Amino acid sequence: MNNQINDFVSKYDGEQFATGAGREIHAKLQKIYLSPTKVGDAELIAKIENAGDELQSFFMENSKAEVPIAGFINNEFLSRRIDRLVVDDATKTVRVLDYKTDINTDKFRDKYIAKMNEYIKLLQKIYPDYKISGYILWLHNWTLEYII
């Protein structure tokens, strides 16, 4: 019985973190820039800097936060918001970053990959000659995962 209670509490705590903290962290992350000067929450900036160069590149002056995107995929109209977008015209690349607060990274993985595929398909219509890639930032442990 005790294990069942622990499992329930653990699940509840994880869901609470994913929803409650998720909104707060998202709001702070959209205001962070690392260059030309550091702007935003100092604690989150430190986590981004400690996570490595690849993650830091999503928070430079050429990045955009909370980017709306809409269009048709298979005759269905979709309207989405990209957490972080970096377009580099010199290298003809587009990189998408989606923040996720889930502790159990496998639970919604298929759903998140499908969402990333939607972003990619919509962006391919805007940037047909660019290489587009997508990443998830798992906020519970600050792991950057390449998806597509």
Predicted feature descriptions by range:
Residues E76-I148:
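Mg2+/Mn2+-dependent nuclease catalytic core
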Residues M1-I82, D88, Y112-A114:
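Nuclease catalytic cores
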